[in-house]
């Protein structure tokens, strides 16, 4: 099994504590509300929302996929770090066992956030991940962060 790692960074004008609350801690409620084309709903399969929790995320009509199962691997609320894995679903296909992510929100000098994302694709056998697949995933993630950022800018009292 090969593991391919990709890193990317985004920036946001929203400070880490507020962005973490919205993107990580309340994502199951917020994303279907502000981006139903991306996520239709989230169903708790196992756990209480902490480490080890498994959720089935029903993707929206704007997605080419129908669902993913998402496992929470780590939550560090003090340092704004979130680790999770996509462990099942048509989005990972038959060549990937799972995709693990580490998201770190770091304060930027301007008062916003630097979002550092590391993705680990755990492949079945000696499969290589195509660059366009990774690029598409990065673009979806950046787009979702922008939707959240715009929501927070338009709702200054939310998630304070």
Curated annotation (Swiss-Prot):
S-S bridge residues: none
GO molecular function: abscisic acid binding; nuclease activity; protein phosphatase inhibitor activity; signaling receptor activity
Protein name: Major strawberry allergen Fra a 1.07
Domain of life, per lineage: Eukaryota
Post-translational modification: Phosphorylated in vivo. Phosphorylation prevents its activity as ribonuclease.
Species for this entry: Fragaria ananassa (Strawberry)
Gene name, Swiss-Prot/TrEMBL: Fra a 1.07
This enzyme's EC code(s): 3.1.27.-
GO CC terms, sorted: cytoplasm; nucleus
Recorded family membership: Belongs to the BetVI family.
GO BP annotations, alphabetical order: abscisic acid-activated signaling pathway; defense response
CDD domains: Bet_v1-like
Keywords attached to this entry: Allergen, Hydrolase, Nuclease, Pathogenesis-related protein, Phosphoprotein, Plant defense
């Amino acid at each position: 099994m090969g593991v391919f790692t990709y890193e990317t960074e985004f920036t946001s004008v929203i400070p880490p504590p507020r962005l973490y609350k919205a993107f990580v801690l309340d994502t199951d409620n917020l994303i279907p509300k502000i981006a139903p084309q991306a996520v239709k709903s989230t169903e708790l399969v196992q756990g209480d929302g902490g480490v080890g929790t498994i959720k089935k995320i029903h993707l929206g009509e704007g997605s080419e996929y129908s669902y993913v199962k998402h496992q929470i691997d780590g939550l560090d609320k003090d340092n704004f770090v979130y680790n999770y894995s996509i462990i099942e679903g048509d989005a990972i296909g038959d060549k990937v066992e799972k995709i693990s992510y580490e998201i770190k929100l770091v304060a930027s000098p301007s008062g916003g956030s630097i979002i550092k994302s590391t993705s680990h694709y755990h492949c079945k056998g000696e499969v290589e991940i195509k660059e366009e697949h990774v690029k598409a995933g990065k673009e979806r993630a950046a787009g979702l962060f922008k939707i959240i950022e715009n929501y927070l800018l338009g709702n200054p009292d939310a998630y304070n």
